[in-house]
C-alpha cells in the first residue's frame, strides 16, 4: 500500500474504523427506513351491519314512568337462602354468580333432609328463599314443606323457583301439585314478550322478540286470577301463556315467582334480576343509572402495521361524539407510555401526531414510560420512569385532568406492590386506579374494589377485545362470539350487573376493522332497545366516590394467598416468595379467657409445630384478622411465620367473636383448621371482666373507677354509653352458636376442633395428644413435658427439667363470684347455652359437662 506524504500512517487504522462505522450507520438507518417507512396503505374497515331493535317503532309510552314497586316483608334480615340441587350444578352456579354480582348476602345449601334454621331471636334470617328445582320443593318432606311455607307466610317472604320439562314425559298438560295452576311442558314458542308487572324494573315492558330456534323444551303456565304473567310466550296457535309466573299467594299464602326456563335465555335472566331487586331492594338501593367508562390502553404501544393511523383517529373523534347520543358526556380515556410515541410506520406515526394534536378532545392517564412491569422494580426505578412519562405528557401538552393511572397488565395493584403505590402518589398524585385481578380474574361477577394507601381501586372489566383482535374475519372462534356477548351475553350483563363499568380496550381495537367501535355502538343499541337503563359517564374520581359510598364494606381489602392464584404468583414482587410455606395451617381462635394461651404454649412443645413470631404490643398474638394489623397486608403477615414445619399455627383469641375475622381468614387460609375452646360463658364473662377491670384500675380509668362490679356493667342499658359497650364485649365471647354461624359460612365443620376448657385445665396432655392426632402429627409424649405447678395452681411446660409457667397475667385467681351474679349471668346465657347444646348434639359432638349441667338446671 502506497502512503501519500500527507497522510500519517498512524491515522490509517483509525480512519478505516471510522469509515466502517459510518458505513454501518447509514446501512442500519437505510434498513430501518426500509422496515419502517413508508407504511402500506390500509384497506378500508369491513362494513358490518349494526343491530336493529325488532320493535324500534313500537309505542310503549303507556308503560313509561311507572313508579318502581318493591316487596315488603315482616322483620327479616337482608339475606337470601338458596337451596340447590347440588353445590356443583351449573345452573346453581349461575344463580350464585348473579347474587355475588349484586352484593346480596346469601347462604347456599344443597337440598337435604333437614332445613337450615330459619329464625333467630324472633327475627327471620332470610328475606327471600330460592329453590333451584321446583319439583324438589313440591315433593319436599311434609314437615320441611310445612315449616318452609309457615316461615314464608309469617314473615311475608317470597319464594323463587325454576321448573324444567321432562323430555321423555308423554304428558303435556299437568296440574301443579296442591294448586289450581296448570302447566304445559315440552313446548315451542314463537314470541317472548315482557308483560306488565310490578316485578319489572330493568326490563322494558312490551319488549318482544320472535324466536327463530326450534327449541321445544319450554314450560308454559296457564294464566288465571291467582296467577300473573311476568314474561309471556306465544305459541303457534296464538295462545299466550306465562313463561315466568307470579303466584300471588292467594291459595296457600306463599307468594312465588316460578320460572319455566333456566337462566340461559337473556330475557329470563333479566327477569330474574328484576325479581331479585323486587324482593330485596328498595328505592334507596336500586337505581337504573349505569356509568360506563371506556379506557384505551397503550395508545402508542404496538407492533408496526397494527397501530392506528390518521383516519382511525378521525373516526375515533367522530365516534366519541356519536356515543354521546347513548351516554351523557361520554369521553374516551387514553393511556400512554411515552417511550413508544412515533414507533410505527409513516402512516402510524402520523396517527400518533394527529392524536397529540387533538389531545384536548380526550381524557389522558399514564401507564409506565416503557410499559414496565411494576413488580420487577423498586421505588427508585419506578419513580424515575414515572418522571420520564410525566415529562413526555408536559412536553406534548397532554391534559391529565384526573389523578387516575393504570398499571401495565395491572401489575402491582393486586397483589399489592407497596413501592408502586408510593411512587404513584409521589409523581402523579394518584388517588384512583382499576384492576381486573381483585380478588381474582374469574369469575368476572366476583370482582370488587378496595382502598389501599389512600388509592381507590375499582373493578375493571374486559369486553372480549384484546391486542390481537383487529379484524372481524380473524376473531378467535368467529365474530359471532362477540355478537352473542353483545346481544344478551356476558358484555350486555356486565353493564346490567355493575353500577360502574370500567372497560379495558387497546389502541389496536380502533385500527383496521375498528372492532371496539362496532362493539360499543351495538352494545349501547341493544341496551337501549331492551332495557330502561340510563347510560352515563363521569370522571374516575366521581366513580370512586360513588362506588365506595354504595359499597362501604369493600373499603378494606380482602387479602388472599397470592401463591394460590397462578396469575397473582407471576406478578409477586421479589420480596415475596412462594418457595416455602409461610401461612398457618391452624388457627386457635379463642374466645378470650378460655385457656387459649396455655393451649398454644403446650402445642408449641411438639417438634413438628411452630408458632408465629411475637408481635410487640399484642402479647404473643398477631391479631391480623381482627384489628389494625390487617391493613399491613399479606407480605407483613407472611413474614411472621419464618419457620417451616409440618404444622404452623397462630393463636389470636380475639378472632372468635370478631365480625370480620371469619371472612378474612377464609380468604387468606381457606384450608386452615380451627380450634375453638368451649368454656362456661358465665365463668368466662366473669374472668374477662375481672381481667379488664384490674387493667383499667391500674390505669385509673374513669369507667373502672365508677364501676364497682360486673353487676353495674350488666345493668347498663344505654347503647351509647361506654359501660354498655363493655357489657357487650364481656358477653360476646360466650355466645358460641351466634358466632359459629359466621365461621361455618366460610369453613366446614370438619375443619373445626372443639376443646372443653375444663378438660384442658385438668388433663392438658390428653387434650394435646388428641389435637395432635387430628392434625396428623407424629405422636409426642406431652405428659413428660407438662407438669402441674402447686404454687401456680395450673399446669406448666417442662423444658430441660425446668418448669416454665405463663406470665403473671395468665391463670390468675379472682375473688369468688357471688351466687346472685352467677344466676344473673346464667340467665343471660341460657338461650345461647341451649343453642350450643342442640348444635353439638345434632352434629354428634362431645358435650362438655358444664354445658350438660347448665341445660339440666334450666330445664
UniProtKB/Swiss-Prot annotation:
Heparan sulfate N-deacetylase 1: annotated span: 34-575
Glycosylation sites: 50, 74, 210, 262, 378, 429, 608, 643, 715
Keywords per UniProt: Disulfide bond, Glycoprotein, Golgi apparatus, Hydrolase, Membrane, Multifunctional enzyme, Signal-anchor, Transferase, Transmembrane, Transmembrane helix
Protein's membrane topology: Single-pass type II membrane protein
GO CC, one annotated term: Golgi apparatus
Pathway entry: Glycan metabolism; heparan sulfate biosynthesis; Glycan metabolism; heparin biosynthesis
Superkingdom: Eukaryota
Binding site for 3'-phosphoadenylyl sulfate: 593-597, 687, 810-814
Record InterPro entries: Heparan_SO4_deacetylase_dom, HSNSD_N, NST/OST, P-loop_NTPase, Sulfotransferase_dom
Name of the protein in question: Bifunctional heparan sulfate N-deacetylase/N-sulfotransferase 1
Gene (name only): hst-1
Amino acid at each position: 500500500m502506497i502512503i501519500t506524504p500527507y497522510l500519517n500512517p498512524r491515522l490509517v487504522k483509525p480512519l478505516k474504523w471510522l469509515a466502517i462505522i459510518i458505513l454501518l450507520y447509514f446501512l442500519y438507518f437505510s434498513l430501518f427506513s426500509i422496515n419502517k417507512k413508508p407504511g402500506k396503505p390500509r384497506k378500508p374497515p369491513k362494513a358490518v351491519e349494526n343491530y336493529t331493535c325488532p320493535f324500534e317503532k313500537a309505542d310503549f309510552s303507556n308503560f313509561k314512568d311507572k313508579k318502581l314497586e318493591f316487596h315488603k316483608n315482616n322483620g327479616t334480615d337482608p339475606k337470601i337462602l338458596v337451596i340447590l340441587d347440588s353445590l356443583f350444578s351449573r345452573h346453581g352456579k349461575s344463580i350464585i354468580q348473579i347474587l355475588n354480582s349484586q352484593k346480596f348476602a346469601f347462604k347456599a345449601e344443597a337440598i337435604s333432609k333437614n332445613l337450615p334454621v330459619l329464625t333467630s331471636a324472633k327475627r327471620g334470617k332470610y328475606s327471600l328463599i330460592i329453590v333451584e328445582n321446583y319439583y324438589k320443593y313440591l315433593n319436599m318432606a311434609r314437615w320441611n314443606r310445612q315449616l318452609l311455607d309457615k316461615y314464608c307466610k309469617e314473615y311475608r317472604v317470597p319464594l323463587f323457583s325454576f321448573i324444567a320439562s321432562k323430555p321423555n314425559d308423554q304428558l303435556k298438560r299437568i296440574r301443579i301439585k296442591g294448586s289450581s295452576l296448570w302447566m304445559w311442558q315440552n313446548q315451542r314458542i314463537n314470541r317472548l314478550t315482557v308483560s306488565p308487572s310490578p316485578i319489572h324494573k330493568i326490563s322494558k315492558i312490551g319488549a318482544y322478540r320472535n324466536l327463530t330456534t326450534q327449541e321445544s323444551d319450554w314450560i308454559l303456565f296457564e294464566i288465571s286470577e291467582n296467577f300473573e304473567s311476568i314474561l309471556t310466550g306465544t305459541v303457534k296457535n296464538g295462545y299466550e301463556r306465562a313463561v315466568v309466573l307470579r303466584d300471588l299467594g292467594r291459595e296457600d299464602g306463599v307468594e312465588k315467582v316460578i320460572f319455566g326456563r333456566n337462566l340461559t335465555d337473556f330475557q329470563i335472566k333479566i327477569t330474574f334480576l328484576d325479581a331479585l331487586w323486587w324482593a330485596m331492594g328498595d328505592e334507596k338501593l336500586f337505581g337504573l343509572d349505569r356509568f360506563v367508562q371506556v379506557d384505551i390502553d397503550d395508545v402508542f404501544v404496538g407492533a408496526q402495521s397494527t397501530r392506528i393511523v390518521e383516519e382511525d383517529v378521525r373516526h375515533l373523534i367522530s365516534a366519541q361524539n356519536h356515543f354521546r347520543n347513548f351516554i351523557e358526556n361520554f369521553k374516551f380515556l387514553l393511556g400512554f407510555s411515552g417511550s413508544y410515541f412515533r414507533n410505527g410506520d409513516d402512516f402510524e406515526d402520523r396517527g400518533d401526531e394527529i392524536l397529540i394534536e387533538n389531545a384536548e378532545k380526550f381524557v389522558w392517564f399514564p401507564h409506565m414510560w416503557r410499559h414496565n412491569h411494576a413488580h420487577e422494580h423498586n421505588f427508585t426505578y419506578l419513580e424515575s420512569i414515572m418522571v420520564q412519562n410525566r415529562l413526555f405528557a408536559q412536553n406534548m401538552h397532554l391534559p391529565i385532568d384526573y389523578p387516575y393511572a393504570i398499571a401495565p397488565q395491572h401489575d402491582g395493584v393486586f397483589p399489592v406492590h407497596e413501592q408502586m403505590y408510593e411512587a404513584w402518589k409521589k409523581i402523579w398524585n394518584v388517588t384512583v386506579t382499576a384492576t381486573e385481578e381483585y380478588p381474582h380474574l374469574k369469575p368476572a361477577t366476583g370482582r370488587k374494589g378496595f382502598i389501599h394507601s389512600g388509592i381507590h381501586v375499582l373493578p375493571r372489566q374486559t369486553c372480549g377485545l384484546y391486542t390481537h383482535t383487529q379484524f372481524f374475519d380473524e376473531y378467535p372462534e368467529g365474530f359471532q362470539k362477540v355478537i352473542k356477548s353483545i346481544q344478551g351475553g356476558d358484555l350486555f350483563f356486565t353493564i346490567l350487573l355493575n353500577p360502574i363499568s370500567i372497560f379495558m380496550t387497546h389502541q389496536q381495537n380502533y385500527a383496521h376493522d375498528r372492532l371496539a367501535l362496532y362493539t360499543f355502538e351495538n352494545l349501547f343499541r341493544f341496551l337501549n332497545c331492551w332495557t330502561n337503563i340510563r347510560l352515563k359517564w363521569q370522571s374516575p374520581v366521581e366513580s370512586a366516590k360513588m362506588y365506595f359510598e354504595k359499597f362501604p364494606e369493600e373499603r378494606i381489602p380482602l387479602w388472599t394467598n397470592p401463591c394460590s392464584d397462578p396469575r397473582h404468583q407471576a406478578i409477586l414482587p421479589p420480596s415475596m416468595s412462594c418457595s416455602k410455606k409461610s401461612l398457618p395451617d391452624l388457627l386457635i381462635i379463642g374466645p378470650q379467657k378460655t385457656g387459649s394461651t396455655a393451649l398454644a404454649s403446650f402445642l408449641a412443645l411438639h417438634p413438628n409445630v411452630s408458632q408465629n413470631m411475637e408481635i410487640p404490643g399484642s402479647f404473643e398474638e398477631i391479631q391480623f384478622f381482627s384489628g389494625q394489623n390487617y391493613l399491613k397486608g399479606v407480605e407483613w403477615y407472611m413474614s411472621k411465620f419464618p419457620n417451616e414445619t409440618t404444622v404452623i399455627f397462630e393463636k389470636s383469641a380475639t378472632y372468635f367473636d370478631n365480625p370480620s375475622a371469619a371472612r378474612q381468614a377464609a380468604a387468606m387460609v381457606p384450608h386452615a383448621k380451627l380450634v375453638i375452646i368451649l368454656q362456661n360463658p358465665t365463668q368466662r364473662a366473669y374472668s374477662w371482666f375481672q381481667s379488664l377491670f384490674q387493667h383499667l384500675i391500674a390505669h385509673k380509668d374513669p369507667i373502672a373507677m365508677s364501676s364497682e362490679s360486673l353487676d353495674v356493667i350488666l345493668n347498663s342499658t344505654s347503647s351509647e354509653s361506654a359501660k354498655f359497650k363493655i357489657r357487650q364485649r364481656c358477653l360476646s365471647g360466650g355466645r358460641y352458636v351466634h358466632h359459629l354461624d359466621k365461621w361455618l359460612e366460610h369453613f366446614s365443620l370438619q375443619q373445626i376442633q372443639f376443646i372443653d376448657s375444663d378438660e384442658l385445665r385438668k388433663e392438658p396432655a390428653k387434650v394435646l395428644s388428641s389435637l395432635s392426632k387430628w392434625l396428623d402429627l407424629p405422636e409426642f409424649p406431652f405428659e413428660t413435658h407438662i407438669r402441674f405447678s402447686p404454687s401456680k395452681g395450673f399446669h406448666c411446660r417442662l423444658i430441660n427439667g425446668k418448669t416454665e409457667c405463663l406470665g403473671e397475667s395468665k391463670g390468675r385467681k379472682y375473688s369468688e363470684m357471688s351466687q346472685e351474679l352467677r344466676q344473673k349471668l346464667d340467665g343471660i346465657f341460657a338461650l345461647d347455652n341451649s343453642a350450643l347444646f342442640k348444635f353439638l348434639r345434632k352434629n354428634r359432638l362431645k358435650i362438655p359437662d358444664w354445658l350438660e349441667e347448665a341445660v339440666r338446671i334450666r330445664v
